[in-house]
Amino acid sequence: ILEVTANRPTDVAMATRSLQGRADVIYTSLDNNVISAFEAMASAANEMKIPVITSDEFSVRRGATAALGVNDYDFGRVTGKMVYRVLNGDAITDIKPEVMNKLTLYVSPKHAKQQGVTLDSSVIADGINVDETKPSNEAS
């Protein structure tokens, strides 16, 4: 496991390129600098043929190969139920925190190919193919 730091969004592409020959895959979470320059990171990963794995649907839509993370729609529904309770008089201290245990797999065969990998058909079947679906925050 290697850690690469990008102190500013303008450092993201260079930090990504520093992994050439040293990493088989890139994982990133929702870091503000990376999110601000995600396309630059994905472009560098494409050039080096290193797949990018992340934790959210929208990064897959922006260039990652895959993500395993919380579905924003489901997260919003849970949050909405908590807000409903508060608005109906429940004390915030009476509402227990909830952990989102249900994770969703998001995949992009198109981005995988650009990053030098082919996703197995079973992986594509088990996930949500963002190349063929609307974002979870858009109405159907």
Predicted region positions:
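Short hydrophobic alpha-helices and adjacent helix-cap/hinge residues
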Residues: 1-140
